[in-house]
């Protein structure tokens, strides 16, 4: 079997979608039975991340004009017609148009993976641009899809709510299980415990509400036990200048913030990471990312909208207790007591602060053993449902079924 995989980016520029799709395509190759051909758009990280694809060698086309459109003159020529089917994890840019034309030309099965892009919150973000894309090509691409890959039941419901009636297969993301026989706490500052956020720093992640709640928890009048023994660590790549807004908010809230960018600390006026309530560490990949996960004591994702977040699965894989919103679409985490539920309210407004405070207070006042048991339940959940060999097997079975094999 030959499968064509169409992506917008084959590098870290696409954040968690890159991590998820690279891992899935590599797992399919490892499982055997399918030849995978990956195509995407070139960006500033394409060469740096090429080695992470292992035996796969993605082919890329150069983008001309605005990156938000992603037009690449040579892209259509990369879409092979001698494959059995195509899998597309792209909706809003030129590759969607190209794969639509490929499907019209070949008539072969097309699997579309929206990765949360059809959720109500995501559709309302940059609404006019998405309406234009829908009118020009996206809706036709969706109507021509043979099947949709939903990451969770909630995403399947969102696909149906968009008016699509084709087959939907729920195939979640997965993660690698790290060896936890060794621990790493050298990154901790003065023995402080770490609450980690790791991911794209974007308004939809709910960090405004989380910081407001953190400020209340860290307040000198707070009744929360052990609050001064913790730091809030925010690591990830900035989008739309939101990191700067969060740093400004720290100042307004009286939180001592420290940034890995030296010039920023002249503004933040926090002399050292040891003295900080909040650490901004910038993007983290590879070994640096692993080090952060190993040195963390808990994980938080207060998001307004997700497909199925890789970051939570990775946190569980490292045995971390998790604070997350229902919009992370991992209800099994709450059901198995691997996560505490917090509610995002409206864009981090007052309605969310109390929920965040309660969740943070519960986490901080738990004993080390209670947090460790919560993290262990998360790792067990990953072992049972979210490893890449399992996900690759589900995907391969879907491909074979679509081809009538």
Region spans (language model):
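Short hydrophobic beta-strand element within catalytic cores of glycosyltransferases
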Residues: 321-324
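Glycosyltransferase donor-sugar binding loop
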Residues: 39-45, 198, 231-247, 282
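A short, well-ordered alpha-helix in the C-terminal region of glycosyltransferases
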Residues: 370-385, 394-396
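Nucleotide-activated donor-binding/catalytic signature segment of Leloir-type glycosyltransferases, i.e.
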Residues: 244-284
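Carbohydrate-associated surface elements
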Residues: 154, 174
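Membrane-proximal helix-turn-helix segments that form the acceptor-binding/catalytic region
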Residues: 131-147
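A conserved mid-protein helix/loop that constitutes part of the nucleotide-sugar donor-binding site
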Residues: 19, 23, 193, 197-218, ...
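Aromatic "clamp/platform" in nucleotide-sugar-dependent glycosyltransferases that forms part
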Residues: 304
């Amino acid at each position: 079997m030959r499968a064509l995989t169409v992506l917008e980016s084959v590098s870290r520029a696409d954040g968690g979608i890159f991590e998820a799709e690279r891992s899935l395509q590599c797992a399919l190759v490892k499982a055997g039975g399918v030849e995978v051909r990956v195509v995407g758009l070139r960006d500033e990280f394409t060469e740096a991340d090429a080695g992470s694809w292992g035996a796969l060698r993605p082919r890329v086309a150069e983008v001309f004009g605005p990156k938000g459109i992603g037009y690449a003159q040579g892209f259509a020529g990369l879409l092979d017609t001698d494959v059995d089917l195509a899998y597309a994890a792209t909706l809003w840019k030129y590759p969607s148009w190209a794969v639509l034309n490929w499907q019209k030309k070949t008539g072969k099965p097309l699997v579309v993976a929206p990765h949360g892009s059809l959720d109500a919150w995501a559709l309302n973000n940059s609404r006019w641009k998405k309406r234009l894309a829908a009118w020009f090509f996206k809706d036709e691409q969706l109507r021509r899809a043979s099947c949709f890959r939903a990451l969770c039941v909630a995403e399947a419901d969102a696909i149906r709510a968009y008016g699509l009636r084709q087959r939907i297969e729920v195939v979640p993301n997965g993660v690698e299980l790290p060896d936890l026989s060794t621990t790493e706490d050298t990154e901790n500052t003065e023995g402080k415990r770490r609450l980690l956020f790791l991911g794209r720093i974007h308004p939809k992640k709910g960090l405004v509400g989380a910081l407001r709640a953190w400020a209340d928890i860290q307040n000198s009048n707070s009744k929360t036990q052990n609050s001064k023994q913790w730091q809030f660590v925010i690591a990830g790549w900035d989008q739309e200048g939101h990191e700067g807004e969060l740093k400004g908010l720290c100042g307004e809230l009286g939180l001592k913030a420290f940034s890995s960018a030296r010039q920023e600390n002249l503004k933040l006026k926090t002399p050292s990471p040891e003295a900080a309530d909040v650490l901004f560490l910038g993007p983290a990949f590879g070994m640096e990312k692993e080090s952060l996960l190993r040195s963390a004591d808990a994980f938080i994702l207060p998001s307004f909208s997700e497909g199925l977040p890789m970051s939570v699965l990775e946190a569980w894989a490292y045995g971390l207790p998790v604070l997350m919103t229902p919009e992370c679409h991992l209800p099994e985490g709450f059901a198995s007591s691997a996560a505490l539920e917090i509610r995002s309210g409206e864009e981090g407004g007052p309605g969310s602060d109390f929920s965040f405070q309660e969740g943070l207070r519960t986490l901080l006042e738990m004993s080390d053993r209670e947090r460790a048991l919560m993290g262990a339940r998360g790792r067990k959940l990953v072992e049972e449902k979210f490893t890449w060999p399992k996900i690759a097997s589900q995907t391969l079975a879907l491909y074979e079924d679509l081809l009538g094999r």
